[in-house]
Structures are given as structure tokens and as C-alpha cells.
Amino acid sequence: MQLLHISDTHLGKRQYNLESREKDVYDTFTQLIDIAINEHVKAVIHTGDLFDVNNPPNRAKLHAIKELKRLKDHNIPFICIAGDHDSPKRKEEIYPQRILEEFNLIKILQKIDNRVKLENVEVYGISHISNVSVNDLKEQLSKVKPETRKSILMLHQGIRTYLPYQGAWQIELSDLPKGFSLYAVGHLHSRRKDYLDGGALIEIAGSPDIMREEEIEDYQKSKKGATLIDMSGDLPSINYINVNIRDQLVLDINVDKIEQSIESVIQKLKENVKNDKKPILHIELEGTVPIRKDVLMTKLQALRDYVEHYRIYKNNIVSIKEENLKTKLKTTYSSLNDIIADYLKGIGYTDEETKIIIDIINEEDEKKVEELLKKFAGVEDK
């Protein structure tokens, strides 16, 4: 029996406020549904963030309805949990998935005691629980005991092993309940898989499109798409199926030789982009000569015929003066007094005047400070 695992589709997301990027997200979802139909899977499991927000735009809801109807026409159930993006932010709100469930297009699993039986495979799921309710999450996980080894647990949570940053994770691998053969996880946008003791598999499908520039490096290595899961053996096996998405690249432009650098970027775009869609370009500025913003923006317009959108991702320009100062600070000065002395001499103070000023700064005795001030002013007591 084969299942298709997808996650973090973020329908309705309008990256960089571009209509073309919103359409890209819809196109990617259509490709995922095509894969499910073409592979004749038993079901699709979606591990959270079907929508980008809890109140998605009408276009996003309409696209979801159209594509999910295609699945239903092929008798392929769509089993999902909610993620942090599409979960309600107020108690009186509902999951947008509930509207789809009302029309029998999907089955949403909200708590751990919800489950779906697919032939001899049990699918459990728990929708996203935030940091403030992490104890409730751990309690729910501690109570679940699958009735069969061929069982799947769907989660949309930060796991410390994969998101080891303060506030980014809610559970550790040790919090996962025992007895499942597959833990299908959403939330992380890059593909991952790990085997636990006993052969159980943690499988992270990742987002099927590039939602943040931090995902570009991993996309270039592992691509994006869906995970085909074969549950027919004693342990699950997986196979990645990629989708065709708009490329995104991070490239340097050196402002010291900006025309030449832009021409080099254009050449790289021609060589590396094989997609029919123009790419998104994230620019890292390099160089040592500051450039006026209006001049920079005018020069960058040469890229417009080759990219869908470009943006300054990082500004790494460091002027020669700044670089020299940093080098001097690292190699020349042994103390704060040396830095102050160098500055004072640089603006015209004599060695003697510089010494007096530094003595005034360092002196704690008020009477001695008064004497030094008089000496500096040339009005010492006779």
C-alpha cells in the first residue's frame, strides 16, 4: 500500500507581495495532486500548514476545493492535521480545513485520539500545539498506544534535533510515543529522514516550494516535492518525487565593478536556470566603495529581463576606511587609552595635551581632576 506525504503547502502565500508567487504556490499544489493520482496512492497525508494563514484568501480556498475534488473523484482520501500557520489565533475561530471537511473533501485529525484506518494501517494525528501548551502536547503523546505496528503518527511540531533554537522546538525525539513505524512530520521546510531504534522512520516531507531564502541551499541539494511511502513491507520505505518550481538563487554583485559584476550575474542566470519561469534573485552586495542607492537601483534594472524579481538580501559593503579602522583596532591598539590618544592627536592635540586629557578621564579623585583641568587650561595655582 502506498501513501503520498506532503506538507507545508501554504496556499495563499504571496511571497514578496508578488501575484506570480501566489500562483506558483497553487501550481505546485496542483502538481502534488497530479502525483497522487498518477501514482494511484491509497491516500494523501498532509502534515500541516495547508494554508498560509488561518483566514486564507478566497482564491486559496477555491483552488484547494478544485484540487481536492479531483482527489475525491479518484477515491483518494486526504488526511491532514493543522499547522501553526493555519491554526486559529482566537478560541472562537475554527480551522479553515473544517470547511473542506464539511464537504467531505478532507479528514482533519485534531487530537491524538483521532485516527483513520487504511486497510491494515492506522493513521494518527495531532494538529499543531503552541509553546504555551507544550505540557498538553506531551501528555497527549504519552497516552497514545497504536494497536498495530503498521501505524503512522502525523505531527506539526518543532523537534529539538532539527530546530535546536530557543523557542523553536516543543518536543524532543524522546517525547515521541513508541510503537509507530512512521512519524510523518511537518513544520520544517527541508526534506529529512532518520531511523530510530527498532527501525521506525521519521520522515519530514518539507515544503514543496521555496517559502524562505534560507531554504535555497537545501533545495539545490535535495529539491522539493512529495514523499511516496510504501507501507507494504515490515517497515516503511520512501521515495522522493520532485515538483517543478520557480528557481531562486543567491548571487553576489560587487559594487566596485558593478557593470561587470551584473553582466556576470546575467551570464550565470542564463547558464543555471533551466526552468521556463524566470527566477527570483537574492543579491548579496560586496565591495569597498560605497554606492548611492539611486545609482545602485538604476544599474540593477539591467536584471529585469532575466528575473521575475530581485531584492537586496545582504549588504556586505565595507569601505576601505572602515576596513582599515577595523584592522588598526585589531592590530595596533593594546588599550582604550591608545585609541583615545590616537584620535586626539588626529584632530590636533599635542602629546602633552593628549596625556592630560587621558589622565583626566582615568582619574577618580575630584581634587586631582580639578588640578589637571587647571593645568590643561593653563591656569595652574602658583
From Swiss-Prot:
InterPro entries: Calcineurin-like_PHP_ApaH, DNA_Repair-Maintenance_Comp, DSB_Repair_Mre11/Rad50, Metallo-depent_PP-like, Mre11_archaea-type, Mre11_N
CDD domains, per database record: MPP_Mre11_N (cd00840)
Nuclease listed as a keyword: yes
Keyword DNA repair appears in the UniProt entry: yes
Induction field: Part of the nurA-rad50-mre11-herA operon, these genes are cotranscribed.
PANTHER family noted in UniProt: COMPONENT OF ATP-DEPENDENT DSDNA EXONUCLEASE, NUCLEASE SBCCD SUBUNIT D
Subunit structure: Homodimer. Forms a heterotetramer composed of two Mre11 subunits and two Rad50 subunits. Interacts with Rad50 and HerA.
Protein name: DNA double-strand break repair protein Mre11
Organism name: Sulfolobus acidocaldarius (strain ATCC 33909 / DSM 639 / JCM 8929 / NBRC 15157 / NCIMB 11770)
Gene responsible for this protein: mre11
